[in-house]
């Protein structure tokens, strides 16, 4: 029976010999067990004093030492940070000498301080965006409130209504003439009332235009007393009579007027006055005293 079993085993695996069949093979180790054996060996080699450099990398990292700054050191660092947020190498070395610190510690402190400053700026901007535009006006940071103590934000006085036109003066037109009575007239009044109220002096005194002094007196006087005040300071104008005639015709509402005839009459009057009006002659250059074109008064040195 044994030979029959061996023959079947040889038929299945011809490379198998009798000696191999007699000695059983040990079981193959699994991958997990193999890795565990390697880790145990590495731990054992790391615990030995004469370990390799690769074993040293597995050691725990050294813990960083936290630097404790004194109040004097923090005061000096903060003062320098307010002046310069990005100090160069030489400045950091000087600060290290003053504060009895290393340059690396000073550099790290400035780096952390800048990060804190940026974070604070971002938080303030986020608060302003959330609160809208009322937040910066209601509560400012202390430096701005110290610089501008007189401004009271959020407590602006209510808008006052603009004064009426009667209270305003126009210095560029009539030397600070009060235009109260003119402004008190209705805006959309009939043409007859406008002509009667605005040109009372021209209807009473044809050919005259009131001067600045007369207009000042006219400001507070009623329309009936206006001609007496205007007659004192009058300046002649060629077109005043036509305007006076038109105003006089417009001021009498009970007389029938033909618009065509009145316009033709006013145009004829304007044409006559324009023809009779002459500008003053401009004095010309003095006549030449028998001098030829080539003679000039040239002063020659003696």
Curated annotation (Swiss-Prot):
GO molecular function (one): DNA-binding transcription activator activity, RNA polymerase II-specific
Q: Where is this motif: OAR?
A: 262-275
Q: State which tissues express it.
A: Expression is restricted to the substantia nigra and ventral tegmental area in the midbrain. Expression increases in prenatally stressed adult offspring in the ventral tegmental area, whereas no changes are observed in the substantia nigra area (at protein level).
Q: Where is this region: Disordered?
A: 1-71
PROSITE patterns cross-referenced by the UniProt entry: HOMEOBOX_1, HOMEOBOX_2, OAR
> What SMART domains would the database entry show?
HOX
The record's DNA-binding region positions are 62-121
Which terms are listed as keywords in the entry? Activator, Developmental protein, DNA-binding, Homeobox, Nucleus, Phosphoprotein, Transcription, Transcription regulation
Q: Which GO terms describe its biological process?
A: anatomical structure morphogenesis; cellular response to glial cell derived neurotrophic factor; dopaminergic neuron differentiation; lens development in camera-type eye; lens fiber cell differentiation; lens morphogenesis in camera-type eye; locomotory behavior; midbrain development
Q: What does this protein do?
A: Transcriptional regulator which is important for the differentiation and maintenance of meso-diencephalic dopaminergic (mdDA) neurons during development. In addition to its importance during development, it also has roles in the long-term survival and maintenance of the mdDA neurons. Activates NR4A2/NURR1-mediated transcription of genes such as SLC6A3, SLC18A2, TH and DRD2 which are essential for development of mdDA neurons.
What is the protein's name according to its record? Pituitary homeobox 3
